[in-house]
Amino acid sequence: MKAKALLLFISFACAQTVYSFGQVDCNTSTKLVCQFPFSAQTLGVFASGSNSTGALATAAEGVATPINASIATQLTQLPIPSATVGVVTLQKKGSEFGTAFDNLGPVLTDRPDTVGKGHIFAGFSYQHFNFNALAGQSLANIPIGFSYTIGNVTSFEAVSNKVDFQLDQYVGVATYGATRSTDISVVVPINSVSLSVTTSNFQGYQYNAGTNSYGQIFSPQTSVSSVGSASGVGDVTVILKHMVLGQEGSRGAIAVGASARFPSGDSLNYLGSGAFGGNVYGLFEYRARLAPHLKLSYQWNGNSQVMDLQSSSKTTLPGGLQYAGGADLKLNRSLTLATDILGNQFVNVPSFTLGKTNLPGPSGKDGIPSSIASTTPTNETYTTANSAGA
């Protein structure tokens, strides 16, 4: 899984002792968004040499905003299991279901087939997501930095982060056949987030433009570790699907549908997105021993506090096109091999770039480096592609 969004915990997301984000009071909150990557000890290292803790908080929050926004966006597009996979219909001659199709189908891509009027399908699955890279760089070593100016003094600060972020998802699915060709499904995820962050190599340099000199230097040997977890119900999704072609057992099948996502997950613990969401989609399938399938959809999202924790108002969570396609091969009546490619487009997502900031004045000597790590907020549109097989 490409972790384009998952640097929320390795940047300067919050200071739990002296700072707060908009309507989120991190002085008292125990939410993950307030605890990582800066514990009280971590921010204490920076604050001890800062000439303005308020300016320090503002600079750190400015870096956190696009990171948290990227996380929330990613959480809206995690794949969920098919709502009809595993249904095997034993057909009697003259029944309303037409030609029996006992290919068990794909795992993460839905297909046009419906369960039939009055029938119920229930399923359960487990998924594990291990986020290990961001913008092409391993989360095992991410340098982050920022700067701020008070009067004649500019502070340049940076750290290195080693991050381990994992999400375990237990998904329950229930589908009811409202009519012969229409299904209603409910998807309920139970999420468990596990996170550990080690922050080290603290660097802090204060440049005084009036005297053209540098002041406080933080020890690069300082290291602070933080561990946290959260679990609970994620965002519940309700899905409506209608088959428009294929009810009579034809080889080709087409269905259309829509889904609504509800912000039931705790977004401040990254168990959910914090926003309502809507999705419209089309499904295509050719029924054969080797059955290709395709899903095309578009995701809309509402407003989420996680998009900007500094603001009292919520900001729209980005959406975009989605696609999923693959094929499933029937080996026998009870065994099917399936493979899928899943893609997501993220439109105008608040993001960031990692780079270097050149230090002014008499840098490059007397222990002062010529440059330091920096993190620059930006907006971008990008796509991700992942594969799955079973």
Label the model's feature ranges.
Residues 104, 116-118, 165-170, 231-236, ...:
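Residues that define the transmembrane beta-barrel architecture of outer-membrane proteins
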Residues 108-109, 156-160, 222-227, 265-270, ...:
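Extracellular loop and loop/strand-boundary signature of outer-membrane beta-barrel proteins
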Residues 110-111, 122-124, 172-176, 186, ...:
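Residues on the lipid-exposed face of transmembrane beta-strands in outer-membrane beta-barrel proteins
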Residues 115-117, 129, 179-181, 191, ...:
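Outer-membrane beta-barrel channels and translocator barrels
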Residues 126-132, 188-194, 235, 244, ...:
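Transmembrane beta-strands of outer-membrane beta-barrel pores
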Residues 134-139, 196-203, 266-274, 299, ...:
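Outer-membrane beta-barrel translocator domains and adjoining extracellular loop/strand segments
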Residues 142-146, 206-222, 314-390:
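Outer membrane beta-barrel transmembrane domains
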